[in-house]
Amino acid sequence: MELYSQNYLRQLENVHNTTTKGFGNKIKKIKAFEACIEKWKPRSLLDYGCGKGAMLQQLRQKYPHLHCLGYDPAVNIYSQKPKQKFDVVFCNDVLEHVEPLYLDNVLQFIEHHSKKYVWLRIDTQPANKKLSDGRNAH
C-alpha cells in the first residue's frame, strides 16, 4: 500500500533537511491529548508522521511507562514502517500534508496499526513553509 508519491517524499525530505525547528510539536499545545493519555492509560503509542521526533521525545519523557515508536517516511531514522499494532496511533499536524490520492491509504494504515485509539489533529490554516514546487506545505 503506497502512502505517498516518490516526488512528494523528496519534497518532504527537503523540508525536513532544511529546517532546524520542528513544526507543531509542543506537547503543551495539546492538553486534550494529555487528558486522553491519562484516561486511556495506553501501554504503546505510534507517532505517525513524527518528523524529527521532537514530540516523540516529549511523550517518552512525560510518560516513561509508554512504549513510543515514531514513523515518518521523510526522516531517515524514522522511515521504517512499523509492523506491530499500538494501543494509540497519534497523528498530530500530519494529515494536511498527505497527498489527496494517498489519503485513504494513510487512514487505512493508521487504522490497521491501532488496537484501541486514534488521535488525529489536523491544522487547517496555511503553513509557514512552502514545498520546493511552490505549494503551501498544508
Q: Model-derived features: where do they sit?
A:
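S-adenosyl-L-methionine-dependent methyltransferase catalytic module, highlighting the catalytic core
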Residues: 82, 86-91, 98-138
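Conserved N-terminal segment of class I S-adenosyl-L-methionine
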Residues: 1-86, 101-107, 135-138
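Hydrophobic transmembrane-helix microenvironments that flank and shape a buried ionizable site
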Residues: 44, 90-93
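Conserved acidic functional residues
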Residues: 72, 93-96
